[in-house]
Each structure stands twice: as structure tokens, then as C-alpha cells.
């Protein structure tokens, strides 16, 4: 995600949001959150909305924790390191993000630093809405992701993209996804 936390960071909050969106009204969910002292969730949801210039310009966070070897727990992050930055077009087409990525990769490579943030102290595993303090545990770069210049907007690549899937459960035991949100995702 391009936000450091998952505003609906517990399975219960996520379930409630889906339930109220389908069976009731999103306004009732908003009222419930405010009346139960969870108004900060609404603020986080509003703050997560943005109009990014390009997926290649964004910072990304796993938002949920993962095992890191036998003893450690981490969150993952991708930090853009490309020199080129896109600008927001005056008119946003439905596929403006794809257009921006293609414009970038027509002329420039893209790159990201891949980092891990080690869990320290009481940093929670079960609530993905809580941001782990980066001053207490800064991200440590462990790799660089390099995306060379290329044309990816082709019918063949679009067809391939429709067949791809991702599950955090497809991980080696040393990198098992942790926390309730991840347990629900791999169930």
C-alpha cells in the first residue's frame, strides 16, 4: 500500500466495514466508529486518499508484519530512488497511472530501495492500523529493485497481467505473514 498503515487494521474492523458497506450504510459505519471512540479510523481513511502522480513515484509499505528468519518480525517498505518524477496531468484519464508509468519507462529506468523495519518493543503485530515508529526502528535497505526502460502497455502484457495473482501466504516459512489481517488473507 502507499500508506504506512492499514486504517482498518484488525479483522473485526475490516469485517465491520464490509458488513456496513454491503448490508447497511457506510454512514452507519462512520457513526459507529465515532460513537465507539474510533474516529481516528475515519481520519486515516480520508488521509489515505490521494491523487498520486505515478506508481513509480510512490513509497510503499507492507502495513502488516512478516516473520524475518527464526526470531525477528519486520514490515517491508519500498522507497523510490529514481531521479525522474512524474507530474499530475491536468485531466485524469481512467488509466492515467498506467500512462504515467509508461511515459516514465519510455525514457527512464525506475528503481526502489527495498527495506525492512525490525519490530522493537511493543510494536503491535495484531493491529495493522498502528504505525511502527521509524525513529525507533528505521527501515534498513536490504536490496534495490531495478525496473529497466520498457514498453509494458501491450495486449500481450495486459493478458499476462490478468492471469497473475499474489498471496502473502506464498512465502517461505522464514517469511510467514503474521497478524490477524494476514491470517484472514491466507485462509
Regions found by a protein language model. Name each.
Residues 1-187:
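Active-site-adjacent core segments of small-molecule enzymes
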